[in-house]
UniProtKB/Swiss-Prot annotation:
GO terms for biological process: reductive pentose-phosphate cycle. GO terms for molecular function: ribulose-bisphosphate carboxylase activity. Keywords: Calvin cycle, Carbon dioxide fixation, Chloroplast, Photorespiration, Photosynthesis, Plastid. This is Ribulose bisphosphate carboxylase small subunit. Heterohexadecamer of 8 large and 8 small subunits.
């Protein structure tokens, strides 16, 4: 099951040339770029680990792609994403994020249904990979 988080998630995986164009777009907008990774793909897991420091002053898409490739080598079985931050007053938040790498096998999620007080149903999503292995060894 392909994880669908961020922009472009329903499209085929982006090539390096397409990633470079998106990086250039973010740089043209003066957005700060960071690279993040995780092995816990839960849809509500918005706190991914940061790869190094945010690339605030880097204005060259090739340098950012170089950092992405370094992260790919170091974390080959993790999800990697680019997060673009707009620090314009009044926005000050992530305005674009997209996945640039995913594990070769994505086992998907299971939905647990629980009946609680008043016959109300509560649903929980859990990743099969998180249940099977500890953090750092999931893929």
């Amino acid at each position: 099951m392909k994880l669908t988080q961020g922009a472009f998630s329903f499209l085929p995986d982006l090539t390096d040339a397409q990633v470079t164009k998106q990086i250039q777009y973010a740089l043209n907008k003066s957005w700060a770029i960071s690279i993040e990774y995780t092995d816990d793909p839960h849809p509500r897991n918005s706190y991914w680990e940061m790869w190094g420091l945010p690339l605030f002053d880097v204005k060259d898409p090739a340098a950012i792609l170089f950092e992405i490739n370094m992260a790919r080598k170091a974390k080959p079985n993790y999800y990697l994403k680019i997060a673009c931050f707009d620090n314009t007053r009044g926005i000050e938040s992530c305005v674009l994020s997209f996945i640039v790498q995913r594990p070769s096998y994505e086992p998907g999620f299971k939905m647990t249904r629980q009946e609680v007080k008043g016959r109300q149903l509560v649903y929980t999503l859990e990743s099969y990979s998180v249940d099977a292995k500890p953090e750092g060894e999931r893929y």
